[in-house]
Amino acid sequence: MAPPSQDVLKEIFNLYDEELDGKIDGTQVGDVARAAGLKPTQAMVTKAAGQEFKRKGEKRLTFEEWLPMYEQLAKEKEQGTYADFYEGLKVFDKEETGKILAAELRHILLALGERLSADEADELLKGVEDGEGMVKYEDFIKKVLAGPFPDQD
């Protein structure tokens, strides 16, 4: 898949411009890159930005300031393929049913690797747990890799 043109990147960037001033919040650097098709970790975003933006309102960035960060992220080896996630979660599927306990998956998201907040984990797990408290991890991985859909419930 060809990378998006600069015009398309600008359109994506503008979708995140909440104050309509031609800028995004520094905390959105990774979100905009992900909306443009990249899959950077938070560590990669911090490295590309040269700093970590922890608080909303701390710094606002123009498209011209964001674009080099995006370009650096685009050069990085793509992180976390479907096969990587599948093999990682399969380890927890003791009965080889294609499912793991939702509580165990939540614990994994909160405690291992690049840890999520409780709210982030809950958002990812929304709608994937079956009536028995299990998650079909193949469907979960596909949902995660499909990208962020911030306004979709």
Curated annotation (Swiss-Prot):
EF-hand domain: residues covered: 4-39, 80-115
Alphabetized Gene3D superfamilies for the sequence: EF-hand (1.10.238.10)
Pfam family, one: EF-hand_8
Key word Repeat present: yes
Entry GO terms, CC: muscle myosin complex; striated muscle myosin thick filament
GO molecular function, one term: calcium ion binding
Signal peptide per UniProt: none
Domain of life the protein comes from: Eukaryota
This protein's name: Myosin, essential light chain
Organism: Caenorhabditis elegans
Origin organism lineage: Eukaryota, Metazoa, Ecdysozoa, Nematoda, Chromadorea
Encoding gene, per UniProt annotation: mlc-3
